Amino acid sequence: MTTKDCGNHGGGGGGGTASRICGVIIGFIIIVLITIFLVWIILQPTKPRFILQDATVYAFNLSQPNLLTSNFQITIASRNRNSRIGIYYDRLHVYATYRNQQITLRTAIPPTYQGHKEDNVWSPFVYGNSVPIAPFNAVALGDEQNRGFVTLIIRADGRVRWKVGTLITGKYHLHVRCQAFINLADKAAGVHVGENAVKYMLINKCSVNV
């Protein structure tokens, strides 16, 4: 409903009353928006910190013609560094890429709320079966496998909302990028957690953009 609509509502003498009511509503909305803006500026929310703690490799096989089968379980930790602002994580998906090419399916992390100075730890599986790899990436990946070290990027994309007191903001895009250096040649570099599974401790700080 616009101010013009409010002025014409009801016709005759009722129009003035409707205009006043509409003016009060618009004024209230403006006050609320100004309040949110001022609170936002004063508190200055800080984006969360993410750390890739470890990766357990169950499978990582490159076969012809340029098909990659991989299966990981990763542990990723998030910390809300704000002392007065909570964070809602919405629609967060984790997956792996190699040289900007997605090599696993996206794994959804359940929506969650993170309070002030709180930590959350997730351990999702990310996997892909016979995923076609670009020929030039397959060559580079084969070279890395021959050297024993493979560099992947673990990504988390989603949306967050900030909670300031009883106020909750709109949704903001969240992009997390974590480098994973995996020593596939030396099994002793990790911990055997199964017949063919090796857990590698990483403790890598991730880049975060909101």
From Swiss-Prot:
Induction: Slightly up-regulated by spermine (Spm).
Glycosylated residues, chain numbering: N61
Tissue expression notes: Expressed in leaves, stems and flowers, and, to a lower extent, in siliques and roots.
Any single GO CC term annotated in Swiss-Prot or TrEMBL for this entry: plasma membrane
Keyword Cytoplasm: no
Bilayer topology term: Single-pass membrane protein
Keywords attached to this entry: Cell membrane, Glycoprotein, Membrane, Plant defense, Transmembrane, Transmembrane helix
Cell location: Cell membrane
GO BP term (any one): defense response to other organism
Statement: the UniProt record of this protein carries the keyword Cell inner membrane: no
Protein origin, superkingdom: Eukaryota
Oligomeric and partner information: May form oligomers or be a component of larger protein complex in plasma membranes.
Identification of the protein by name: NDR1/HIN1-like protein 12
Protein species of origin: Arabidopsis thaliana (Mouse-ear cress)
